[in-house]
Amino acid sequence: MNRGFVFIFRLAVHGIRMKKILAAFILGMGCMLAVQAQQHPCVYVAPADRASVLQKVKNEPWAGEAFAAIRSKVEKYVDRHQTDPEWITSRLAMYWKDGERYTQCYLKKQNWDYGEGNAPVPTVRMPGMRTWNKYVNVPLEDRTPYNETGDMWGINKLNPSEPSVKVPYKESGHMIRGNNVEILTLAENAAFVYWVTGEEKFARFATDIFNVWLVGTYYMNPILDPEKSCGSVGGWEPGGICGYYDYEQIHDDLVMHAAMAYDFAFDYLIRHPHAHLKAIGKDTKTVAAEVFKRFINIGLVRGGKSGNWNVNGWNIMLRPMLVLDHNEAYADGKGKEYYLNLLVNESTPYHDAIPDILKTYDRVTGLWPESPGYSFGTVQSLLDWAAPLKRAGIDIIAGNPILQKAAMAVFPWMDDAANMVVFGDSRGGSANFQTFENLLTYYTGTDNKEGVEKVASALNKGISQKKYSRNNAGWTGLCTYTATIPSVRAESNERASYSPHHRFITMKNWEGDYKMMFTLYGGKKGYHLTPNGLALQFYAYGYALAPDAAAYESYWSKDHGYHQSPTGSNTVLPG
């Protein structure tokens, strides 16, 4: 006989009523299940963190301004939504027309070809092309509601003053995805404002957008590519670069924004399911988990095994992984822990895990092998993961000093104005100071005073040179940044640096007023670098003395040869 029943029987014999025991037993089991269920929000904050975020917003000017900016961007749409709830959802790019609510899309030569099937609800429209075009979407107010054709009104990026034009669906570049990302980002931000303030108008707005996206994605099968233009036939077949619903898995980012709307507005979402889910007897949590896992499962066998494609691929998958329940909640045993193990410990034939990712960094220089934009975009992504992974019980910084070295490797490649050097297919611009914010949070939490001083110095320099402002932190900054940046002494910069892999030398003299700097680039093939002979560039007063060619327009545009005078920037020499 089961010992539990023997115990109950004996208690009953001693005069304790069976009903009370069973009630206590059921209550205890319910408490155990409640402990096992995932609380929300859970990715960047827990429910108990709301008070500290509110205090930060109230007491710190930068946080108050950052929160006000988030709220102001969404509130006009939220207020309209109370009387006109279809206005925003009708602007999602969907297959709206009954009879053409496709459940299966096909691509050909890396462009949308045709669709099949007809779902009981509108389904999410697939982007028209893998490549981009010269247009951006007109403002939301000017977009076509319930757009049945997929043709998009666009503004010429090269000449924005021109009248807008209607761009055919199959020539729409990234306009479809950009439209849906914009609207889901509004939902994400509104969900955050709801979590902070408790104002349900923000939750309703976020929920209505999320629900239309969720049921519209639920009825979609992964795209098919019969001619393997993206590396496989698509569907669930491993290999190639297609995502669940984009030509490139690293661009399959609708799920990132949807996952955060789900996380912040979870309690409201669960109470307000889409009418169609109620009609088919399904609940929001079950369907959301299924949809999130589709993006993850496709992502795990697509994209790139190494390099920035691998890191960017994990970046798409991480948030939906973290909003899942624990393994035992799912019939296939694949919940949060299962998927995180593949990121943190276990490389696969399709994706390197973090230990193998970190082997890519040069142990001496701390540099990633690709050009500057990719090098520091990659370490930024890794450090972006640090806070949510630590909340999930995983510290990726403590045992990996190369990750900290990689973040600091940006300094030799910055000029005095905190701009990045330019070579290969990088586009320059300011360094990403969020890298240092992430480290400041970590070092503060681990009481690493030396680390705090180094990254605080970089942040203070960016602020003093007006290259960085915490006022633009966004909700991730409000959740994770320290309340203040300590005042510390300025860090001295390296006089010279050399990367044999990149064939790149920097030399600096920042002691005087001129802030002089010199770079010499040799170039090589691959890694987003360019084998263009020797290129010299001179800087003074914190600026390049002549314009650099920077990156090309796109991967698909032709190369252009150029040459300047001996004193010009990026003079190309034979060799």
What are the functions of these language-model segments?
Residues 176-408, 414, 427:
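Aromatic-lined, polymer-binding surfaces characteristic
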Residues 38-168:
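Low-complexity, Ser/Thr/Pro/Gly-enriched N-terminal "stalk/linker" regions
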Residues 2-3, 17-21:
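Positively charged n-region of N-terminal signal peptides that target proteins for export
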Residues 33-37:
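Sec/Tat signal peptide C-region and signal peptidase I cleavage site
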Residues 5-9, 25:
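Aromatic (phenylalanine/tyrosine) cluster motif
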Residues 23-32:
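Bacterial N-terminal signal peptides
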Residues 45, 50-55, 62-65, 369-575:
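Extended polysaccharide-engagement surfaces of secreted carbohydrate-active enzymes
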Residues 151-176, 233-244:
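Internal amphipathic alpha-helical repeat/solenoid segments
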